[in-house]
């Protein structure tokens, strides 16, 4: 039995969850999210709890059980608290700034790199070496943060590049000269 799938999702006050066939819609104070869920997993709403049941112990159903519960839980958490992902810029002259809605990165290329967030996502630049991505959809927040990090991945010799806050980059020893 999936330990994640067994736990019910608690619906906080101010959040409404509706199921229309396979479509799950979650409305809350920060916005609205909807997603298609797998038809095999049985979902029941009792009071302020959502429970998930799988039809059999097949490998596919066991995998889907916890996944569907986690997806709905992330939607509920997103419309109440929201998600954020912080990134740090390490390197001489590496700077981040905002120009209107766009993020402008100066990370050692001959040109500044501009990144435009998609609808529903917000980029903040609290300092010129820190970038914070915020939104209600956990997947999209993580994807945008990953795209920003991919502009200049952290390198193992000097540690220069864009990394997630708190990420450990394994360092390598340089070549020894004669």
Swiss-Prot record:
Assembly, per entry: Part of the 50S ribosomal subunit.
Family (UniProt): Belongs to the universal ribosomal protein uL6 family.
Lineage: Bacteria, Bacillati, Bacillota, Bacilli, Bacillales
Species this chain originates from: Shouchella clausii (strain KSM-K16) (Alkalihalobacillus clausii)
Any single GO CC term annotated in Swiss-Prot or TrEMBL for this entry: cytosolic large ribosomal subunit
Alphabetic keyword roster: Ribonucleoprotein, Ribosomal protein, RNA-binding, rRNA-binding
InterPro entries in UniProt: Ribosomal_uL6-like, Ribosomal_uL6-like_a/b-dom_sf, Ribosomal_uL6_a/b-dom, Ribosomal_uL6_bac-type, Ribosomal_uL6_CS
GO molecular-function term, one example from the UniProt record: rRNA binding
Protein name (record): Large ribosomal subunit protein uL6
Keyword RNA-binding among record annotations: yes
Biological function: This protein binds to the 23S rRNA, and is important in its secondary structure. It is located near the subunit interface in the base of the L7/L12 stalk, and near the tRNA binding site of the peptidyltransferase center.
Gene3D superfamilies: Ribosomal protein L6, alpha-beta domain
NCBIfam families: L6_bact
Gene Ontology biological-process annotations: cytoplasmic translation
């Amino acid at each position: 039995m999936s330990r994640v799938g067994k736990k019910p999702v608690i619906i906080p006050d101010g959040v409404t969850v509706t199921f229309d066939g396979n479509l799950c819609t979650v409305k809350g104070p920060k916005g609205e999210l909807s997603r298609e869920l797998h038809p095999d997993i049985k979902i029941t709403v009792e009071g302020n709890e959502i429970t998930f049941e799988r039809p059999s112990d097949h490998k596919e159903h066991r995998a889907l059980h916890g996944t569907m519960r986690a997806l709905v839980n992330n939607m509920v958490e997103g419309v109440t608290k929201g998600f954020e992902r912080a990134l740090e810029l390490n390197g001489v002259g590496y700077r981040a700034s905002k120009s209107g809605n766009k993020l402008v990165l100066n990370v050692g290329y001959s040109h500044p790199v501009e990144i435009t967030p998609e609808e529903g996502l917000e980029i903040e630049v609290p300092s010129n070496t820190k970038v914070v991505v915020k939104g209600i959809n956990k997947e999209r927040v993580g994807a945008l943060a990953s795209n920003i990090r991919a502009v200049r991945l952290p390198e193992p010799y000097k540690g220069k590049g864009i990394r997630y806050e708190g990420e450990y980059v394994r360092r390598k020893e340089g070549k020894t000269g004669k």
